[in-house]
A protein has these predicted regions:
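Short beta->alpha linker loops
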Residues: 74-77, 217
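Alpha-helical interface subdomain recognition
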Residues: 1-67, 181-333
Length: 333
């Protein structure tokens, strides 16, 4: 068995086991993930990491989405990669990333706030980019933490700091784009899981003397759902491959992937709930954590409008004659 197969098998087993613990606290979920070394997936082996590729990251994060894993494995993977690239030390506990930052950095100290931070209240370190600098805030230094959750009950906290000491290094990374990669992979997995559940339910639920999956109209809707799920997976694979090849210059592929994933969510979740009916909306039912996450992730790290504008500007900038050659030259990175 290859290293990639071993990685995927380990992630599938661990995430599946953790997903079954619906009432488990954060520490009970995060502890096994951290102990298994998943946060260090993109850190080179020479620096104590797994030495995985961006495609490995896609596979792991897709499985996190498939199992609706309630902890920030993607954010931790990106945080560890950023810290390693910047030559900064890895923290002992959870390191996460801040989608939004508002404040001032002066002489190695930060005053302001970071918002929408995945599990920010649980984090040892919070990474953000401000004025071309990667800054690492210590969670314990927060003057105040305002706990918030997205519609899927995932922690999205706001932390306030006053004259807090930070570690920092020059950084050109776009945290919105990196976060969009995380969400695209998670969306791909959650779409696949919701599709599988919808097909299984359609083959079990009977109306008018036969399984509802035998009705042509429903079969057509599920076929469209399958197309959307496949499109998200293809776009996600391409974006992660481009990130591995082009680094920060992969914005076009990231924008296309996150936008494609966002669009697919509306189609896929509508079909899933049409198939399941009322039971699909109950919190106890396994479809519920998937679709609530999909609706939440659609607006995180860039909504439809944000990534549409990014794509539009790049198309216009390339010009009519150069756009197609540019696009095809970057295909299948």
């Amino acid at each position: 068995m290859s290293d990639e197969s071993l990685l995927i098998d380990a992630a599938a087993r661990l995430f599946g086991d953790l997903a079954a613990k619906r009432d488990a606290g954060f520490a009970d979920l995060w502890g096994p993930v951290a102990e298994a070394g998943f946060p260090l997936l993109l850190v080179p082996e020479a620096d104590g990491g797994f030495g995985g590729s961006w495609q490995d990251a896609f596979a792991v994060l897709r499985l996190a989405g498939y199992h609706a894993l309630a902890c920030p494995v993607g954010e931790a993977i990106i945080a560890a990669w950023l810290l390693n690239a910047a030559g900064l030390a890895q923290p002992e506990g959870l390191a996460t990333i801040a989608p939004r930052i508002d404040g001032k950095l002066s002489d190695g100290r930060f005053t302001g706030s970071v918002a929408g931070v995945p599990w920010g209240g649980e984090a040892t370190a919070i990474l953000a980019v401000l004025d071309g600098q990667l800054i690492v805030l210590t969670g314990a230094d927060a003057e105040r933490i305002d706990p918030h959750e997205n519609p899927a009950d995932e922690s999205r906290d706001t932390l306030h700091f006053t004259d807090a000491a930070v570690a920092q290094a020059a950084c050109s990374a776009d945290l919105t784009a990196l976060g969009a990669l995380i969400r695209t992979a998670q969306i791909a997995g959650a779409m696949d899981a919701a599709l599988a559940q919808s097909i299984a339910y359609a083959n079990e639920r009977e109306q008018f003397g036969k399984p509802i999956g035998k009705f042509q109209a429903l079969q057509q809707n599920l076929a469209v759902f399958a197309e959307e799920a496949a499109a998200v997976n293809c776009a996600g694979h391409a974006a992660f491959a481009a990130a591995g090849k082009y680094g920060g210059a992969a914005e076009f592929e990231v924008a296309a992937a996150k936008l494609r994933a966002n669009i697919a969510i509306g189609i896929g979740t509508s079909t899933a709930h049409q198939v399941h009916g009322a039971i699909g909306f109950t919190r106890e039912y396994s479809l519920n954590p998937l679709t609530r996450r999909l609706w939440s992730w659609r607006s995180e790290f860039g909504n439809d409008r944000y990534w549409s504008q990014i794509l539009g500007r790049q198309v216009v900038a390339a010009g009519a004659d150069a756009f197609w050659p540019t696009l095809t030259s970057r295909s299948d990175p």
